[in-house]
Regions:
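Extracellular glycan-recognition regions
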Residues: 1-264
Length: 264
């Protein structure tokens, strides 16, 4: 059964982009969008993402992705975060976050004013105390798995990221699956490890990788799970296209279809 759409947050999308039904929907990724990380903890988080927090400890998630894959690195699939997802929250969620910060600042200002007003005549006037030091939040761990178009063929893809950076792995699909444009992928928690799978229509689920450290030191409430689409390539228009007009494939959005999303 698909998850409730009301629990999802849109990242790098308008808040209205969350579909009413999560069983079948589409995400459109413009050119030059990606979810990636290079040292030192520099995130590229421009890919459209829909994610949700879980009421219960994460068990597994799976979905089928498909698209007209055309450009190098076109991709879409599942993503899981252990910590705050990097990127821009859309619409109402962003406004609510801004309101919370404003309210906190107003409360702090009121407290400071009240303290100054009530100071006795014997107290020595002093400058405002410096703000408390708040260390930056550690970069979140995340993993994405899906279907990616690379070297003119579709592959099962996975990326694992820590605060130090990310790695990228491609797996060739079996010959009987190589010409298909869809793939069902799954992520599953086993102990502290995150197992990454894809489904072969002949032999069933096949292991892509085991991420042994993913859930180590992670609170259940910090886990966020969802889907993403991205088109990292950005080649720009050719001279012919600029002269004759009309959008080329390099300037069009990648529309990724998601079917049968399940999150446990």
């Amino acid at each position: 059964m698909p998850p409730d759409s009301s629990s999802f947050t849109a990242l790098n999308l308008s808040s209205t982009a969350v579909p009413e039904w999560m069983g079948s929907f589409t995400l459109a990724a413009p050119p030059n969008t990606d979810l990636w990380r290079k040292p030192p903890s520099r995130d590229t988080s421009t890919a459209p993402i829909l994610y949700t927090a879980l009421r219960n400890p994460f068990v597994a998630a799976e979905v089928t992705v498909s698209a007209d894959w055309e450009l190098e690195w076109d991709q879409g699939g599942l993503v899981i975060f252990a910590g705050a997802p990097p990127g821009r929250i859309g619409g109402a969620a962003a406004a609510a976050a801004a309101a919370t910060v404003t309210a906190a600042q107003t409360t702090t200002a009121s407290t400071t004013t009240s303290t100054t007003t009530n100071a006795g005549p014997d107290m020595v006037a002093q400058g405002d105390a410096p703000p408390a030091y708040v260390p930056p939040a550690p970069a979140s761990k995340w993993v994405k798995v899906g279907l990616e178009f690379c070297n003119n063929a579709c592959h099962a893809t996975s990326v694992c990221a820590t605060s130090d950076g990310a790695d990228w792995a491609l797996t060739a699909l079996p010959p009987h699956h190589a010409r298909r444009l869809d793939l069902r992928v799954k992520i599953e928690r086993i102990g502290y490890a995150l197992w990454v799978w894809y489904e072969d229509e002949v032999s069933g689920w096949k292991k892509l990788r085991e991420v042994t450290w993913f859930f180590w030191g992670v609170e259940d409430k910090a886990v966020r799970v969802g889907v993403y689409a991205s088109r990292p390539a950005n080649f720009g228009a050719t001279h012919y296209e600029r002269r004759h007009g009309g959008p080329s494939v390099t300037q069009r959005n990648l529309c990724v279809d998601f079917e049968g999303l399940e999150i446990f």
